[in-house]
């Protein structure tokens, strides 16, 4: 069975990567019922949070709990995770270059600090996609008002880790519609010139 990516749109975009047997849920968001309804009777083998903000991670325990799946988060976002889930810690500390496998495809962890210190992207060469959380969106960068965003680091992460991917790669963001690396590359210089005030706020992102 071929791997595919399903989407649930609620507070954020949730991406479900897998086939008819097993899936990995990326950014479970806030609505566990909606995510699990989309998953159906497939086994959740992992839940990955691109960062620890409430909008992306609130439903992690409920989604993972159904099939006792491990939850993965970069350790640099542990503080924001604890603001949502208290003393319940993630099971896997992600690091740059880590690999998750599902349905015959690999998801590579790309540490992309900026929106938060522990933000990551997940690149799947087999499916020509990168799931980028709040690293960027179709209309620009996504900022956070929690005091942990770093605009310069965010630009650096995008330039070094996203724009270097093949131009046809589909970018699946945490908010809004998908786009391609080629489209992001055309906008990059304008983001630099405009500065941090031009970035789109993400609310509880």
Located regions from the model:
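Core dinuclear metal-dependent hydrolase active-site scaffold
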Residues: 1, 16-18, 97-124
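Conserved beta-strand hairpin/beta-sheet module of binuclear metal-dependent hydrolase folds
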Residues: 1-42, 121-133
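Active-site HxH/HxHxD metal-binding segment of metal-dependent hydrolases
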Residues: 9-10, 30-106, 187-194
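Short Gly/Pro-enriched turn/cap motifs at secondary-structure boundaries
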Residues: 5-7, 91, 111-113
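Short catalytic-loop micro-motif centered on adjacent basic/acidic residues
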Residues: 24-26, 46-49, 111
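Metallo-beta-lactamase
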Residues: 23, 111, 117-205
